[in-house]
Amino acid sequence: LVTSGFFPGSLWFLYELTGDPQWKTRASEQTERLERIKNLTSDHDIGFRMGCSYGNGYRITGDPAYRDVLIQSARSLATRFQPEAGVIMSWNPNKRWKCPVIIDNMMNLELLFNAAIYSGDSSFYKIAVSHADRTMEEHFRPDGSCYHVIDYSIKDGKVRHRQTAQGYADESIWSRGQAWAIYGYAVCYRETKDRKYLDQALKTFNMMKNLENMPEDLIPYWDMSAPNIPNEPRDVSTASCIASALYEISTMDVPDAAGYKMYADSIMVSLSSPAYRAALGTNGNFLLMHSVGSIPHNSEIDVPLNYADYY
């Protein structure tokens, strides 16, 4: 599954925060079940799967076997790089798309940045930067909002289409896509110190923050352009990812770092309230309620999602 790395990652967080060895044991067991994925080249989500599981495991334990899995995972991800377009292909070609790249793919670049450090192979870093740069050029509208899917030509690298798959419409503001962009470019700034990446993260965040229909509790609707607001489902996974990105940004040397932390704190107050945080033993034992996977696909509507809990 695309999302198989988030639960092991959450277990690593529990071990990190409590020091209780039972969580280390459980995290290791769940992480090591994913080892075979290190050779998977059929989609881009290996970054999600392995960065959240093995990435946290290596960060916390320093186990060299975990480092080796991460390097091999990065090699697998790098096979999807398309030089003419300068991007990592997200999904495989079909009748509709030739080289589709989704904004979610920004979340996979951290695996490449880390692998460059672990291995000394600068090609991982160069691929990550190339992907971030081309995505910045092609995915974003003048107001800072982003498309979900950009389809490129493999032959000459030109853009064929700008679309959405999981949002309300091609020109709508699909909320979780904006969260992926904010988080992904915050990581790019942290790893490269190139200010343009931070500027992009903040431009997209400020666009979301300043939307007139942003709810008072700061938990976005699944798509901020959906037609039936305020009677549209919220997406808690968007809120948790934005908060996580803002906490990251607040640790950086940026103007008004305290303001970004304050906004993240406000999101966390909402997420911790009974409106969104499930009572113990309910909600399938997930922490958070009211996330949305994909309304256009009639999939995971108003349900708990493991990546909402993770972020």
Predicted feature locations:
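Glycan-recognition and catalytic cores of secretory/periplasmic carbohydrate-active enzymes
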Residues: 1-311
